[in-house]
């Protein structure tokens, strides 16, 4: 099945600047998102009798590896991501942690990947399912990869309005950067699953049953010393900074850093992540 333009855009993004930035910031991002990882591991651990779990949009594989550690010898935890740099990092980290026998990492678009039919007891995702150009097709493909009654469990962001920390940098720098990409409602991206009715419709149309969508508010932290790396490498601002002249780049970073002052408490940056915890059955 041919990819369309949106899929090509996502592949280019996550195999380019954004993907390499995530690899470079892997440690700080994994630490910041550790609470979500724990929630997903706990949800999947009791739903995977044979230890076969698929992690969608696995990035550098932290959740995949955590599942493998929790499920123990004999488990088979598979991470899939469209980003080649992230998958390479995931494989390297699995080797480093001696988890190669329990893990596998696939560089592919989960919307179109030919997974083993009914091959998984559980399917999970930490912020990895909001980027499909055709979410119904994607979740149908994932359902075909799930065994009967297998559990789907993923975490997605609520709205940008409810997550001011996540948009602080781009909002502050926007007056200096008129060409910076603007987030579009319901488009593939971080806040693509902000609307609960949309999530429910996608799950229903793709054949999943017993959907549950719960509000999830999680306190997250980041070391203040890592804040400049975070705001200058990630998100819409991080993707355009390298295109700017030195003066404009410096002004944009200064404006963005000032916007984070309300979140800085001594040596720590704190914010509340407003998310959805979503589950369903195949």
Regions found by a protein language model. Give the residues of each.
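A short acidic, Gly/Pro-enriched loop at the edge of an enzyme's catalytic core
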Residues: 111-122
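Conserved catalytic/acceptor-binding region of the Class I
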Residues: 136, 143, 151-222
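Class I SAM-dependent methyltransferase SAM/SAH-binding core
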Residues: 52-113, 137
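Conserved Class I S-adenosyl-L-methionine
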Residues: 2-4, 9, 13, 18-21, ...
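A short SAM/SAH-binding and catalytic strip from SAM-dependent methyltransferases
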Residues: 121-135, 158
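Short glycine-dipeptide loop
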Residues: 50, 73-74, 146-152
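Conserved hydrophobic residues forming the short capping helix/wall of the S-adenosyl-L-methionine
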Residues: 71, 94, 173, 203, ...
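Conserved alpha-helix/loop element of class I SAM-dependent methyltransferases that forms part
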Residues: 31-51, 66
């Amino acid at each position: 099945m041919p990819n369309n333009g949106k899929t090509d855009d996502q592949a280019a993004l996550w195999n380019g600047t954004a993907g390499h930035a995530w690899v470079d910031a892997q440690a700080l991002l994994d630490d910041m998102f550790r609470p979500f990882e724990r929630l997903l591991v706990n949800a999947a651990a009791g739903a995977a009798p044979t230890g076969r779990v698929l992690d969608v949009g696995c990035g550098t594989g932290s959740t995949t590896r955590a599942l493998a550690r929790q499920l123990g010898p004999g488990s088979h935890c598979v991470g899939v991501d469209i980003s080649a740099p992230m998958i390479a990092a995931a494989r390297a980290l699995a080797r480093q942690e001696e988890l190669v026998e329990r893990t596998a990492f696939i560089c592919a678009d989960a919307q179109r990947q030919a997974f083993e039919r009914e091959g998984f007891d559980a399917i999970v995702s930490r912020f990895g399912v909001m980027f499909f150009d055709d979410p119904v097709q994607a979740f149908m493909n994932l359902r075909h990869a799930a065994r009967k009654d297998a559990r789907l469990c993923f975490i997605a962001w609520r709205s940008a309005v409810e997550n001011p920390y996540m948009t602080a940098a781009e909002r502050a720098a926007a007056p200096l950067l008129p060409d910076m990409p603007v987030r579009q409602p319901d488009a593939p991206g971080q806040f693509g699953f902000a609307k609960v009715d949309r999530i429910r419709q996608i799950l229903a149309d793709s054949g999943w049953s017993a959907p549950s969508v719960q509000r999830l508010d999680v306190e997250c932290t980041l070391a203040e010393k890592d804040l400049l790396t975070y705001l200058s490498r990630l998100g819409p601002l991080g993707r355009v900074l390298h295109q700017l002249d030195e003066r404009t780049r410096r002004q944009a970073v200064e404006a963005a850093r000032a916007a984070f002052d309300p979140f800085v408490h001594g040596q720590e940056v704190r914010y509340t992540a407003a998310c959805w915890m979503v589950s369903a059955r195949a």
